[in-house]
């Protein structure tokens, strides 16, 4: 028991030290960026990201640095990652929109009923992490309210337990829906141009071409190839090395 406690304490202190070092590196990148040394800031922030540290602020700053040196695809990639973590941040949304102006391809999604646009807004208002926490939180709160209603039968209103239970179900449905959607992730085209094939083979017919910075959905993968789908429903295959997952 004592050895386990010592191990956990050491793990905690090493974790705290690593967090402090990461924060110090991040601030070093901020200082370099403010001084106009974008390449140094990018190098430092990239090293932090490659250590496995991911936050909305880090991804946003990486997007800004790539945008400054005209790395369109990487800028969009990191802005998209930042948006997944900070879905309501206006600066992230604005800069992502600005970066998208450089995209050559214009893919129009089919017209849908306006109610589905509202559903998308509600779904994307929270990050997946936030939805998970809300689902768990309302689940625990629902159990507590139901137990309290049973133990204090006749002395408390059943309105609160009912409302909490409904919210738990709603967030549960949205969380599961979002998880299913995220199981087929999006990616960004990272090369100047890629010819989309009709099959996962270099000799297959070219069906259309895509350019740097376009967002695509990954439907499946096969031996170094990605089966992709565009917002307008077109599908095809591209080499996996020519896109990077968000």
Regions found by a protein language model. Give the residues of each.
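Boundary regions of SH3-family modules and the immediately adjacent low-complexity/disordered segments
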Residues: 72, 148-149, 158-191, 198-201, ...
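Membrane-embedded alpha-helical segments of integral membrane proteins
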Residues: 110-151
């Amino acid at each position: 028991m004592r050895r386990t406690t010592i191990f956990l304490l050491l793990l905690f202190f090493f974790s705290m030290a690593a967090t402090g070092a990461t924060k110090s590196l991040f601030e070093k990148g901020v200082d370099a960026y403010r001084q106009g040394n974008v390449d140094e800031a990018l190098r430092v922030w990239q090293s932090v990201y490659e250590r496995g540290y991911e936050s909305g602020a880090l991804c946003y700053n990486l997007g800004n640095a790539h945008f400054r040196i005209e790395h369109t695809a990487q800028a969009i990639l990191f802005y998209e990652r930042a948006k997944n973590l900070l879905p309501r941040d206006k600066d992230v949304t604005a800069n992502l929109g600005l970066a998208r102006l450089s995209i050559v391809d214009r893919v129009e999604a089919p017209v849908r009923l306006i109610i589905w646009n509202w559903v998308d807004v509600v779904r994307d208002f929270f990050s997946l992490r936030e939805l998970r926490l809300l689902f768990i939180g309302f689940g625990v709160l629902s159990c507590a309210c139901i137990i309290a209603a049973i133990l204090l039968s006749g002395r408390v209103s059943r309105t609160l337990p009912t409302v909490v239970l409904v919210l738990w179900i709603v967030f549960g449905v949205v969380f599961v829906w979002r998880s299913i959607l995220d199981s087929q992730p999006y990616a960004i085209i990272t090369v100047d141009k890629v010819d989309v094939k009709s099959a996962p083979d270099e000799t297959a017919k070219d069906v259309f071409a895509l350019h740097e910075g376009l967002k695509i959905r990954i439907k499946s993968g096969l031996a170094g190839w990605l089966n992709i789908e565009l917002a307008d429903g077109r599908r095809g295959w591209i080499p996996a090395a020519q896109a990077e997952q968000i």
